[in-house]
Amino acid sequence: MRFETIGNPQNPAVLFFHAMGVTGASSEPVARNLQERYFCILPTSTVYCAGQTYAGKADEVRQVEDFLRSCGVTRLALVVASSIGADLAMAFLTQTQLPVEHVFFDGGQFAQIGKSIRRIMVPFLYLAIKSLYWSKGKTLKKVMWCDDESIKPYFIAAGQALRYGNMRRQLTDSLEDKPFPALPDEVQKHTYFEFGSAEEHYKYCEAVKKAYPYGQYPVFEGYQHMQFQIRDPKGFAAMLTSIVEQDRLPELPFLRKEKKAA
């Protein structure tokens, strides 16, 4: 893995897990809006590190914990995981001994996919991500709902470093067709499983609710996958700050209102 930090190590720590096809630097726009109050840690998965070999989620978790210890981090104010980063974040949450105060999943890809299907997915995902490097980001609209210039550098960097073997190994132990790992009830109460109502991953929401009945489930009405984070990193950072400091979401105009029981 490769690690970047933003902010003062003496401040409360926020750990990010990035989405598929990008590097950890993709969290920089949000982290820079948090750096005055928090110490932000941005790992890049071994999958997107040139010269490194992905050895499994347990090894990724070990590397993250080793780095946190080297920085003197003894607890985490917040874990933020985007898309497939939710898969690794969940492994981290169930294995780490570090206290974690809050968790925010942004469009978590809580898919449970059979082994044979995951094997078929590998060449398609590999070519999609490599094409972003080869085309200098021009093919982004083919794999994403947007093609914002601001996010293209993260896809290009990931595509440049990606090797087929690492993609194959990651899909071997990610998005597995297994029950979701258990989370203590108290952890669930401070965990936000957010989905945009317009994103494909929204279809996983009900399954996640059944697995984690004490979690928080905000829905961003009309929003696409990670749209708030991508289009408004300052607003997204302010939302995360509210979660850490007040244990609640701020008023958001696109937040779906909960239906009251009759």
Model features per residue range: what roles?
Residues 32, 41-78:
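Active-site loop/oxyanion-hole signature of alpha/beta-hydrolase fold enzymes
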